[in-house]
């Protein structure tokens, strides 16, 4: 069975990922399009299903979906799996799924449905007008006088666009089927499919986070930046020492240090020759430009209700075939140079927001 769905959620999937996307209270599946055994594509308008005593297409879809013997195909199957699992409150075992996107990436094709269609010169191409339809129906809209102050567009607000949205979902299934047929001469080995299944279980399980550590790290970062800004203003007398233009002028005119820019490598190089206030200011500049806390912000954005963050890895995400990081980029964590004992104490101090004690321990 080939599947494509259209959904709505007030959570921004580009910021929070598919798993938290489905946790929004207003998350729902709007349209399901599917084909069984290469047959005609059926489209289910989910806004009407609850109002009908029996919906033949929907019942047929559920029978196939819940049958472990039926292989389910989708382009970026993780999204369909995650959304359908939430909708039915039932697990969607990855062992039953095939990801056409991953299988395309395995043979050097792009990771987007429309790009793959273009490269393969398929007769059926993804409808490029779909992005506008997604913006209209799948994400909140800005309240205006013209739209009556509403924050969401429903089918009744534009029936013509809604029918176009249904047709767009059908077209996506057509393209996905055409891609699967086109790449069938490059079969996926059993072991590679098993690796993808493992990957899905890893992403589904996620990683447990410490909410108090994230909060403490963000508070510490804010406090540290405020203190550094205070020091910078005192040293330079500038209204905004964060401004590259102001700081470069101060370094040149008042300190005699003609530095071309404030990029990290440049600052590190000029620190070797700087003295006095100029040296202190460059040291502060390096501290102020640190971005490690952004990972904590991303963790917060992606954290699910059970305080786990999911969907952190993309199978075959790189052209070489290796995994690629998504969201938090766990494979790229900052390296530390303190002992395990100091690290454990530091974590506890950050959780408790005892920053003066942390400063004594690590001189931060």
Tell where the protein language model's regions lie, with residue ranges.
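Short, conserved, GDST-rich strand-edge loop motifs in beta-rich repeat architectures
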Residues: 17-19
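Active-site-proximal helix-loop-helix substrate-binding element of RNase H-like nuclease domains
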Residues: 27-29, 34, 38-59, 64-184, ...
